[in-house]
Amino acid sequence: YPIQDIPLSHPIFNIVFKITEKAQVPSIQYWRGSRDGTTSERGESTSEVHIRGMYDKNGRLMVVMTHNTDIADGWEKEREDHDYFERFAVKKSYPLGINIVVYALTH
């Protein structure tokens, strides 16, 4: 099964929450140490976020994977830093995670 970029038009980006961009979520450690507000941990050359998937022979999405974004830190680091939680968990990580779970449960 080839790995393919999932387009923003896919239902996974709007089944519950309307997601209009593939958000870059830095690790909490990088974000705390970043003085210039960047979210790309390895510089400008890695600033493009990819959300990719694998589809079955009928075109159903089976696997979701992310690249150049640490979406899971937004799910697991909510009590460590209130600003990080508000900026990344509430606005970026949770909406995508909820959409992925709801999509998986309904398809």
Positions of predicted regions on the chain:
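Extended, composition-driven regions rather than compact fold-specific motifs
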Residues: Y1-H107
